[in-house]
Amino acid sequence: MIVVSDTTPLRHLIAIGEAELLPKLYGTAIVPGAVWAELQAEATPLIVKTWLGSPPGWLEVRSSHAVVSNEPALDALDPGEREAIQLASELSANLLLMDDREGRLFALRRQLPVTGTLGVLERADVVGLLSDLP
């Protein structure tokens, strides 16, 4: 299964200690270079930066081969969202992980299957990967 992730779902899953759901559900997760850069930004929470210090083998950073877009709607997105959509399109990804509403709408118009952080958690719960909360 080919899964491409934008910044926010990965950052949220790391922050709540549930990043390991990604390989359990999907195998490898691919992030474009812009997402990797966003994850390393100064404002990124320390827990995420620490996790990125020793990234797991299931997380793969790949560059998009897309040239500059001539689509104003795509250009309006931030670099991570833009590259995640472009990479998901190039790879014919089975799933794009994205929380941003505008990015999700654009991806859906491109007929890319999209889910967000809550969708990942819901799927994990359905297949029994989450323990019951108190």
PLM ranges: what are they?
Residues 43-45, 104-134:
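Acidic, PIN/NYN-like endoribonuclease modules and their adjacent C-terminal/linker elements
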